[in-house]
């Protein structure tokens, strides 16, 4: 099955408002799936550091989007039923540009999401229905460690929690 067919099969059936986001108990499983998808499918992104950087960009987009919406607003970090993948990707890139402006101390001004529209669509769909801001703090910290532990462990094996994992 080609990517276009896969993308069509997985098109959302409805628009997602913030109130539709579901709490999740185990982010490790979801984040491991995202990391594994990157490692196995995203062309040109195979090093753990690059995978971690792109995933962090997307996670900041997701959290920022959730925090900036009221319960009745549509979330931007989600696919939409009548939207093609290029329109979707433009919306996610626009969201990341807002995130970069908000977090100048974390992201470089010239930093970009380096994922094709089709791959971006698949990855976003894995987490679009979940609320990351309503997850328990320790679950988020565990997920970050699971997701980017290999890329960002210090020489002694210590793990530095990212700013997003603290409230």
Show where each model-derived region lies.
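Dynamic helix-loop-helix/coil hinge segments at AAA+ ATPase domain boundaries and subdomain interfaces
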Residues: 152-160
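Conserved S-adenosyl-L-methionine
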Residues: 162-167
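Charged, often flexible domain-edge or linker segments that flank or initiate folded functional domains
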Residues: 1-101
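Long recognition/docking surfaces used for binding and targeting
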Residues: 56, 60, 64-152
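Alpha-helix N-cap/helix-initiation sites
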Residues: 45-53, 133-137, 158-159
């Amino acid at each position: 099955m080609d990517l276009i067919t896969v993308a069509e099969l997985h098109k959302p059936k409805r628009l997602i408002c913030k109130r539709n986001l579901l709490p999740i108990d185990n982010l490790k499983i979801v984040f491991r799936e995202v990391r594994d998808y990157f490692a196995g499918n995203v062309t040109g992104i195979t090093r753990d550091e690059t995978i971690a950087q792109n995933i962090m960009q997307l996670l900041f987009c997701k959290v920022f989007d959730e925090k900036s919406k009221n319960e009745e607003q549509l979330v931007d970090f989600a696919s939409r039923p009548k939207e093609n993948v290029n329109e979707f990707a433009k919306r996610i890139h626009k969201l990341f540009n807002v995130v970069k402006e908000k977090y100048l101390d974390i992201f470089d001004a010239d930093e970009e999401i380096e994922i094709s529209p089709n791959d971006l669509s698949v990855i976003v769909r894995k987490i679009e229905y979940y609320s990351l801001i309503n997850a328990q703090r320790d679950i988020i910290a565990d997920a970050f460690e699971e997701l980017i532990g290999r890329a960002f462990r210090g020489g002694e094996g210590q793990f530095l929690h990212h700013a997003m994992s603290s409230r």
